[in-house]
Amino acid sequence: MEGCVSNLMVCNLAYSGKLEELKESILADKSLATRTDQDSRTALHWACSAGHTEIVEFLLQLGVPVNDKDDAGWSPLHIAASAGRDEIVKALLGKGAQVNAVNQNGCTPLHYAASKNRHEIAVMLLEGGANPDAKDHYEATAMHRAAAKGNLKMIHILLYYKASTNIQDTEGNTPLHLACDEERVEEAKLLVSQGASIYIENKEEKTPLQVAKGGLGLILKRMVEG
């Protein structure tokens, strides 16, 4: 069938947005609402992925579990946050989705909101109690991702919710190292203005100023030292 992503018909219906057919199937056999497919995904995971809000709401009304993880550790909230499904994120949080759940990579939904530049979703997650300094398996935070990607508004949002600017990942890099390395000028200036250190060395014994390209290092040095 079209939209065949799963070995379970009910998951394919959820992914392709066929609400009436999905309702018929589930009302005939309630267990289908929570059955898992080859990826350990339920209909809820697939509806979140494709952004079918009505199907998500139908499944949530049935009381399906909101925190079940697929075989890569992704919850429905991870999927919805990464895919930019604002209304679905709101609905999942309203049903008690765990905002700091981690997947196999140690990532929370906020990590994906930050790297994909999902502003409204990041705010919803943070308002819902997301830890702004949660670290993935590389000890990187949402701030590392926003800085590397050059997501200026996301950095503003994270700063508003008191995210740290000086956490080091497994390579010893702070968000400022990454911003400098990727030539994210405005992002680097914002980080320094909010307390990011220009003196922290990474594992290669380099400071952010030493990885900065062009005239960025000088700009940042002047900001700090005058």
From Swiss-Prot:
User: What is known about its subunit structure?
Assistant: Part of transient complex containing PSMD10, PSMC4, PSMC5 and PAAF1 formed during the assembly of the 26S proteasome. Stays associated throughout the assembly of the PA700/19S RC and is released upon association with the 20S core. Interacts with PSMC4. Interacts with RB1. Interacts with CDK4. Interacts with MDM2. Interacts with RELA. Associates with a CDK4:CCND2 serine/threonine kinase complex. Interacts with ARHGDIA and increases the interaction between ARHGDIA and RHOA, hence promotes ARHGDIA inactivation of RHOA and ROCK.
One of the record's GO cellular component terms: cytosol
Predominant cellular place of this UniProt entry's protein: cytoplasm
| Intervals holding ANK repeats | 3-36, 37-69, 70-102, 103-135, 136-168, 169-201, 202-226
Could you tell me the keywords of this UniProt record?
Answer: ANK repeat, Apoptosis, Chaperone, Cytoplasm, Nucleus, Repeat
Give the region (Interaction with RELA) as residue ranges: 39-226
Provide the protein name. 26S proteasome non-ATPase regulatory subunit 10
The gene it comes from is: PSMD10
User: Which BP terms in the Gene Ontology apply to this protein?
Assistant: apoptotic process; negative regulation of apoptotic process; negative regulation of DNA damage response, signal transduction by p53 class mediator; negative regulation of MAPK cascade; negative regulation of NF-kappaB transcription factor activity; negative regulation of release of cytochrome c from mitochondria; negative regulation of transcription by RNA polymerase II; positive regulation of cell growth
Q: What residue spans carry the region label Required for nuclear localization? A: 1-37
Please tell me the species this chain comes from. Homo sapiens (Human)
Q: Which Pfam families match?
A: Ank (PF00023), Ank_2 (PF12796)
Q: Does the keyword Cell division apply?
A: no
Instruction: Name the coiled-coil region(s).
Output: none
Is the keyword Repeat in the record? yes
Please give the Gene Ontology molecular function terms for this protein.
Answer: RNA polymerase II-specific DNA-binding transcription factor binding; transcription factor binding
Function of the molecule: Acts as a chaperone during the assembly of the 26S proteasome, specifically of the PA700/19S regulatory complex (RC). In the initial step of the base subcomplex assembly is part of an intermediate PSMD10:PSMC4:PSMC5:PAAF1 module which probably assembles with a PSMD5:PSMC2:PSMC1:PSMD2 module. Independently of the proteasome, regulates EGF-induced AKT activation through inhibition of the RHOA/ROCK/PTEN pathway, leading to prolonged AKT activation. Plays an important role in RAS-induced tumorigenesis. Acts as an proto-oncoprotein by being involved in negative regulation of tumor suppressors RB1 and p53/TP53. Overexpression is leading to phosphorylation of RB1 and proteasomal degradation of RB1. Regulates CDK4-mediated phosphorylation of RB1 by competing with CDKN2A for binding with CDK4. Facilitates binding of MDM2 to p53/TP53 and the mono- and polyubiquitination of p53/TP53 by MDM2 suggesting a function in targeting the TP53:MDM2 complex to the 26S proteasome. Involved in p53-independent apoptosis. Involved in regulation of NF-kappa-B by retaining it in the cytoplasm.
Which tissues is this chain's protein expressed in? Tends to be up-regulated in cancer cells with RAS mutations, including lung cancers and adenocarconimas (at protein level).
| UniProt superkingdom | Eukaryota
Q: Where in the cell is it found?
A: Cytoplasm; Nucleus
